[in-house]
Swiss-Prot record:
Protein name as catalogued: Putative phosphatidylinositol kinase L615
Organism: Acanthamoeba polyphaga mimivirus
ZnF bounds (FYVE-type): 36-115
GO BP term, pick one: phosphatidylinositol-mediated signaling
Family classification: Belongs to the PI3/PI4-kinase family.
Residue ranges constituting the PI3K/PI4K catalytic domain according to the UniProt record: 407-677
Start and end residues of each stretch annotated as Catalytic loop: 537-545
Annotated stretches, region: Activation loop: 556-579
Keyword Cytoplasm: no
Residues reported to bind Zn(2+) 1: 42, 45, 66, 69
Length: 701
């Protein structure tokens, strides 16, 4: 998590004397090429693409144009450093680029901009060698308009850097030149704190207009004086307006919880104790459920931490309730599996701070689940008499619920690849069915945390209950986990097997309720279903991992494939599973409810895309995905530098293409026959018959 990487996810060994020319920025809105499947019209002339009007990527801005609007070629200099990368290898244009000579295809707008940037590159480089503040730059004459625009764009774009960004020397110079104006501008304060190498203070102190700093020859005095000045900037009143400082719409006067988490993500091990205390004072004000949704991050911090003061802050934050202590303890125990000696020492030191009697109890209960895992292939014998000889067992994700017995005659083994087991337990609150999976559920846990946070964010911003369905998930080891099964819910596959439509099923389950209320519940949940699909990139969507509650709430299960990955990548399906059966419930395409559904999806996009840092941080806690994969997905899906209308348009295109897409039908076919082994058996039969034919032909000759 703390490994420094550049914005392509690679280890960064940037030379401090980097050539200024290599930092000329173009103010591109895209970080990766726009995905082909998200666009149906030319970015410029808006004409619809067809078999005759084909798509062409501009190699400079990454947008998609028709031939007429992107038919210019120019050499794009290497010093333009914010060119978007191909989103993935499915873009045909990715391969065509390598067939071109030095001149590359660009749109009309980029053609003239590249020429202008090339002509002014030397002037820009001279300014960036020792950049002044935004106030100084604004005083330059009209003849410097391109240079001013470049400076403004660079400063503005700093606010969109991902949490893993490694700051160039030019980034640092521009940040420090403007530091005195950052008071009460939260997003700039985040990057001011993150741009400083707190271990060495390798920065130009005079940028702070504080000459007295240089007289402190003693390193600790120097560092303290420097820290005091940063604290002054944080606490000082606002000096310039958001408009004058080119702030984003998410700028606030005080750092938020998300801002603090962003700073901790990459700087937690080197921040001075006073800054840590300041950040944790803000984090302490956050509701427990949000803290719990970030528990995986805090556990990773504990695992890598050797700072006793930070350990104290973490202990105070994470031990406010027995529920939180249980949750953190279990995640810590699991994290030992992939830890070195120092990490295990750090984890154990934190556990020793907990109440000793409670630790003994949690350890005993952990051993119960560890024993169950060993016997999952045939759990009946293990569970038959276990509750006669041991005390009640707490659920790790909710210790107030105690397992008191088990329905051994109702244990079911599911017919899927890893053969997960469903066990029905007696508890102090009634029967609970738990699915034990023989694979990692860390993806599921992180996705469920994000879904829960999305619910909170939507409520806070528009006061709307979208009927998001969440359910407890708990890793037991790195290769096993437990998921509590939602009561009174069925998969769409099960509903269709009953010869019912989704609409009929919901009506049958709600005979005594007002139909319009039921339809509204379903519509709201369909909005959340759509937004989760889009912003998390849920893959492997088929009718057996989409469920509907008896109340009419539709929701996802099984998050083994996220970030646009899929079990059947060759189907090239869209990121959202929608069919006519799902849409008929709200009246189908063209209905009033369908229009409201689209409008709510658009509002959700505007709200959730502001939280791209939160998504990046939580998704990066799962080691199954490389950082550059997560980064490319976040930048292509959230597009933080783009206008809302562009991202909304792309989502609407996906929704439109999702209606009964043939690839979705193929996916359901492949999933069903893979589960039933009919496809495998059929192929075996075909191969056997082919072999018999060849054999008989050989014998006859």
């Amino acid at each position: 998590m703390n490994q420094k990487q550049d914005n392509h996810g690679n280890n960064n060994h940037r030379d401090d004397n980097i050539d200024i020319n290599s930092s000329i920025m173009f103010n591109n809105k895209n970080n990766v090429w726009v995905d082909d499947v998200m666009v149906s019209r030319c970015y410029n002339c808006k004409k619809k693409f067809s078999m005759l009007r084909r798509k062409h990527h501009c190699r400079n801005c990454g947008n998609i144009f028709c031939y007429n609007c992107a038919n210019k070629f120019i050499v794009i200099p290497n010093f333009i450093n914010d060119r978007p990368e191909p989103a993935d290898y499915w873009n045909i244009s990715y391969y065509i680029t390598s067939l071109k000579d030095e001149a590359e295809r660009v749109c009309d707008n980029c053609y003239y901009k590249v020429k202008e940037k090339t002509a002014n590159s030397e002037k820009i480089a001279n300014i960036l060698k020792n950049p002044g503040s935004i106030v100084d730059i604004s005083k330059l004459s009209v003849s410097y308009s391109d240079i001013k625009d470049h400076y403004y764009n660079h400063l503005r774009n700093i606010q969109y850097y991902l949490p893993n960004h490694v700051y160039s020397q030019i980034d640092k110079k521009i940040i420090l030149a403007n530091a005195k104006y950052f008071s009460k501008h939260s997003k700039y304060l985040v990057h001011l704190i993150k741009a400083i190498d707190w271990n060495t203070i390798k920065i130009t102190d005079d940028k702070f207009d504080s000459p007295s700093v240089s007289i402190y020859k003693n390193r600790s005095q120097h560092k303290q004086k420097f820290l005091d000045h940063i604290c002054e900037i944080i606490e000082n009143p606002k000096k310039v307006s958001c408009q004058d400082l080119l702030c984003t719409r998410t700028c606030q006067e005080q750092l938020s919880f998300d801002d603090c988490i962003n700073i901790l993500y990459s700087k937690v091990q080197e921040l001075p104790d006073s800054l840590l205390q300041y950040l944790f004072a803000i984090i302490e004000l956050t509701p427990d459920d949000i803290i719990k949704n970030h528990a995986v991050l805090f556990v990773n911090i504990i695992k890598n931490n050797s700072n006793i003061f930070l350990e104290k802050l973490l202990y105070e934050l994470l031990t406010k309730s027995e529920d939180m202590i249980y949750y953190i303890y279990w995640l810590l125990v699991i994290s030992k599996e992939k830890a070195d000696y120092q990490d295990i020492t750090n984890i154990q030191r934190f556990i020793e701070l907990l109440d000793k009697q409670l630790v003994v109890k949690m350890d005993r209960e952990y051993r119960f689940y560890a024993g169950l895992i060993k016997h999952l292939n045939d759990p009946k014998d293990y569970l038959e008499n276990i509750f006669d000889i041991c005390d009640e067992i707490s659920l790790p994700y909710n210790p107030s619920i105690k397992l008191t017995g088990v329905y051994t005659d109702q244990i079911r083994i599911k017919n899927s690849y890893t053969r997960p087991v469903i066990i029905a337990f007696e508890t102090n609150v009634g029967r609970i069915d738990i699915l034990f999976k023989k694979e990692s559920v860390m993806n599921d846990l992180i996705v469920m945390n994000l879904i829960s946070l999305c619910d909170v964010i939507i409520k806070e911003n528009i006061g709307l209950e979208l009927g998001i369905v969440v359910y407890p998930i708990m890793p037991l080891t790195n290769n096993f986990g437990m998921i509590e099964i939602i009561k009174n819910a069925e998969t769409i596959h099960s509903i269709i097997n009953q010869k019912k439509t989704v609409f009929q099923h919901i009506i049958d389950k709600n005979e005594n309720k007002v139909i319009s209320d039921i339809m509204k519940t379903y519509m709201y949940s369909l909005v959340s279903y759509t937004l989760h699909s889009y912003f998390i990139g849920l893959g492997d969507r088929h009718l057996e991992n989409i469920m509907i509650t008896d109340n009419g709430e539709i929701f996802h299960i099984d998050f083994g494939f996220i970030l646009g990955t899929d079990a059947f990548p060759l189907t090239l399906t869209s990121d959202i599973k929608l069919n006519s059966g799902m849409l008929d419930v709200i009246g189908g395409r063209g209905s009033d409810r369908y229009k409201i559904y689209l409008d709510l999806c658009a509002k959700g996009v505007i709200i959730l895309r502001k939280y791209f840092n939160m998504f990046f941080i939580l998704l990066s806690q799962n080691s199954n995905y490389k950082i550059n994969h997560i980064e490319n997905f976040i930048m292509s899906r959230f597009q933080p530098r783009q206008h809302d209308t562009v991202v909304i348009s792309e989502l609407m295109t996906i929704i439109e293409k999702s209606h009964d897409a043939y690839t979705g039908i193929i996916r359901d076919f492949l999933h069903y026959h893979n589960q039933e082994k009919t496809l495998q058996n059929g192929m075996t039969k075909v191969l056997k018959e082919a072999y018999d034919v060849v054999k008989s032909f050989t014998n006859s000759t």
